[in-house]
């Protein structure tokens, strides 16, 4: 049988122009996809933080009720040495990034019963008076900057280089937060990505955030987040 030589074009590769077109298309897709992925990661970190604060507050309240004990819920201010301008030995240079609940013994000594929960690396609690009444001037009498021998050491090299603000769950499930006063009974925290701190003002959070609010009388809490249903 006669045979035919294979077509030369069958083994021809891509031309330089074709390769450049492919590279350009990949670049365009990358430009579109990277911001979207970044936004998804930020949203995921905030969702994780919302679940953490809600779950731990519920556990602390349940512990107070079931054990008939006073439980202190602390918000820790710590510095991250990997962040520019922050010094691990100076908590004043850091942000509120962790929380924990402790049983208060009859002698007033705190006994850690809840684990120390650290927020995802990119998430912080905004320290503004108006965005976080639990951390601002209204909570000045519950802010501790001098750590004592009875206070626990924090992990990850923090030790006792931290400050904290706290409130308490009472044995009946209520809190020691005032239902009136300067906050009109509105006690809350605003969480957002650290990188968005410059997008926030004293009165306005950045575009991507959530607010955790606690009822001073019932001790129950809920999450408020733009575009999402209220989570209790």
For each feature predicted by the language model, list its residue ranges.
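Alpha-helical hydrophobic helix detector
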Residues: 20-36
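Internal alpha-helical transmembrane segments of multi-pass membrane proteins, especially GPCRs
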Residues: 12, 18-21
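N-terminal helix-rich module
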Residues: 2-7, 11-14, 32-62, 66, ...
């Amino acid at each position: 049988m006669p045979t035919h030589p294979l077509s030369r074009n069958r083994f021809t590769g891509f031309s330089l122009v074709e390769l450049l077109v492919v590279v350009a298309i990949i670049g365009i897709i990358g430009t579109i996809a990277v911001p979207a992925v970044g936004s998804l990661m930020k949203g995921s970190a905030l969702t994780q933080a919302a679940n953490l604060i809600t779950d731990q507050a519920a556990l602390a309240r349940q512990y107070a009720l079931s054990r008939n004990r006073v439980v202190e819920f602390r918000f820790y201010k710590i510095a991250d040495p990997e962040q520019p301008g922050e010094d691990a030995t100076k908590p004043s240079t850091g942000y509120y990034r962790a929380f924990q609940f402790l049983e208060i013994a009859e002698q007033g000594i705190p006994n850690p019963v809840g684990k120390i929960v650290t927020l995802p690396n990119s998430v912080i609690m905004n320290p503004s008076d108006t965005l976080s009444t639990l951390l601002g001037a209204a909570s000045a009498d519950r802010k501790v900057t001098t750590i004592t021998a009875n206070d626990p050491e924090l992990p990850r090299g923090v030790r006792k280089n931290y400050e904290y603000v706290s409130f308490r769950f009472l044995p009946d499930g209520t809190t020691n937060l005032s239902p009136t006063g300067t906050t009109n009974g509105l006690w809350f925290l605003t969480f957002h990505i650290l990188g968005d701190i410059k997008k926030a003002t004293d009165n306005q959070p950045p575009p991507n955030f959530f607010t955790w609010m606690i009822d001073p009388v019932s001790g129950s809490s809920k999450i408020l987040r733009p575009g999402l249903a209220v989570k209790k």
